[in-house]
Amino acid sequence: KNNVVIVATGGTIAGAGASSTNSATYSAAKVPVDALIKAVPQVNDLANITGIQALQVASESITDKELLSLARQVNDLVKKPSVNGVVITHGTDTMEETAFFLNLVVHTDKPIVLVGSMRPSTALSADGPLNLYSAVALASSNEAKNKGVMVLMNDSIFAARDVTKGINIHTHAFVSQWGALGTLVEGKPYWFRSSVKKHTNNSEFNIEKIQGDALPGVQIVYGSDNMMPDAYQAFAKAGVKAIIHAGTGNGSMANYLVPEVRKLHDEQGLQIVRSSRVAQGFVLRNAEQPDDKYGWIAAHDLNPQKARLLMALALTKTNDAKEIQNMFWNY
């Protein structure tokens, strides 16, 4: 049997409600890793299991500090010859961000699988136990090597880059506009596609070369009608290095906002990345805005929250918008 480490970080999968009928009202991050493993003894038939409690938080409360700490712990684990795979139990709210970040900064061919649940461990028909079993099955599979970081939810295997939480009340909560990598049936993975984007061993970013417990400041401004420039100005004043504009449609920005945002870019060096609030599709460069003229960046198909992480990592390497644009094409 392969050796799999379960790294617990909290979330709904470690949550507890007042009664078994509380599936949506509960306290997250209450159940420790040993209890999670004990609740699914069948995982011991799949692999030799070790548990580590890295964090105990609801995932919306994760900051750069926790994200970097987790990446370093996971990196240390996969470097050990005795470890064949890692499962990370995680809150679903920001699971896609953590998965994508690890996909960019941890250099390994070993399976790293993030898993969570939509119902707390105390709920009737809790989804966490089967999800955890399936995640261990995936992480212990030799077929799961070189796939990049994955998210396993509801027996679907997703690429960290593509996956997003698309539904907040059902167990089939995670989706990818490009489809799942595969599916799991009774502990066996069946594969249908792979990602052509750079990840893990092919990434130019490396957690071992990132110092400190904070990334360059990048924030998101959500687009709508009747917008004001105040949020952009406030973030610039606070020292933020880049803003992800979660624009309407094709990453659009209202014409009455453009002069002020361009001023912040030109005079204060505030980088602007155009993403979209639309769940599917991608942002075309020089379509709604003349990005070449403005020196702005198009996020391609990355949603705003993933664009924020890639931009933060990009700023650890360069301030050149053309170089950063290439990163958005390649990752």
UniProtKB/Swiss-Prot annotation:
Its EC number is 3.5.1.38. It catalyses: L-glutamine + H2O = L-glutamate + NH4(+); L-asparagine + H2O = L-aspartate + NH4(+). CDD domains: L-asparaginase_II (cd08964). The keyword Hydrolase applies. The active site is at T12. GO terms for biological process: asparagine metabolic process. Residues 2-331 form the Asparaginase/glutaminase domain. Homotetramer. One of its GO terms (molecular function) is asparaginase activity. SUPFAM superfamilies: Glutaminase/Asparaginase. GO terms for cellular component: periplasmic space. Substrate binds at S59, T92, D93. Belongs to the asparaginase 1 family. It comes from Acinetobacter glutaminasificans. Keywords: Hydrolase, Periplasm. Its main location: periplasm. This is Glutaminase-asparaginase. It holds the Pfam family Asparaginase. The gene is ansB. PROSITE patterns: ASN_GLN_ASE_1, ASN_GLN_ASE_2, ASN_GLN_ASE_3. It is an enzyme of class 3 (hydrolase). The keyword Cell wall biogenesis/degradation does not apply. It is found in: Periplasm. InterPro entries: AsnASE_II (IPR004550), Asp/glu_Ase-like_sf (IPR036152), Asparaginase/glutaminase-like (IPR006034), Asparaginase/glutaminase_AS1 (IPR020827), Asparaginase/glutaminase_AS2 (IPR027475), Asparaginase_C (IPR040919), L-asparaginase_C (IPR027473), L-asparaginase_N (IPR027474). SMART domains: Asparaginase (SM00870).
